[in-house]
Amino acid sequence: MMNADHVEHVRAVLRESAEVKLRAAELCTEEIARGAELLAQAYAAKKKAIVFGNGGSAADAQHFVAELVGRFVHNRAALPALCLTANPSTVTCIANDFGYEELFARQLDAYAEPGDVAVGISTSGKSESVLRAFARARELGCVTIGLTGRDGGGMPALCDVCVVVPSDATARIQETHITILHLWCEAIEARLFGMISR
């Protein structure tokens, strides 16, 4: 027999997750829409997305890149995108030789071109490797888009667009981030290819 406390906990967590998304719908829609616009504009100009984050945010970055290069809903042309945590040899080389804080900035030196979009993900907005990457991306002429939560940390000052999810709970922030990344995929497919997901 299922423990009633466990069932109620599941219900409470699902409601909490939904409530964070509802708050984001009230507070973050302009930034989310602007992020979609900047990504679509970059792809229309034959630029690429370079995506990065640590831990769970690295997984979100990899997920986003997979849906850009592969597909989200519709079969369409592949879109150029790189995830800066996907190559273990590169990650460990840079972390060992230059320090972990330089992990993403060093790769931007190698890959980024003016007009590319640097998308950084950090639930706290305080990850030094992400902040350094945004500073380097700006020096290199990239558009900068951030996904964060809590009070945004140092990210809003370094981003052309920064979506600050209205929550202090890491898991709830991450759940909202993946929804936003899916919204961006949907918007890109609609604007570039006329493919509507609904």
Functional labels for PLM-detected ranges:
Residues M1-L27:
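Generic N-terminal amphipathic, Lys/Arg-enriched alpha-helix
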Residues V20, A45-K46, L158:
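Structured helix-beta-strand junction loops
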Residues H6, C28-I32, S57, R138:
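Residue-level recognition of alpha-helical structural elements
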Residues Q62-S197:
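Glycine-rich phosphate-binding loops that contact phosphosugars or nucleotide phosphates
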Residues E26-A45:
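A short, well-structured juxtamembrane/interface segment
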Residues K48-V65:
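Glycine/serine-rich anion-binding loops at beta->alpha junctions
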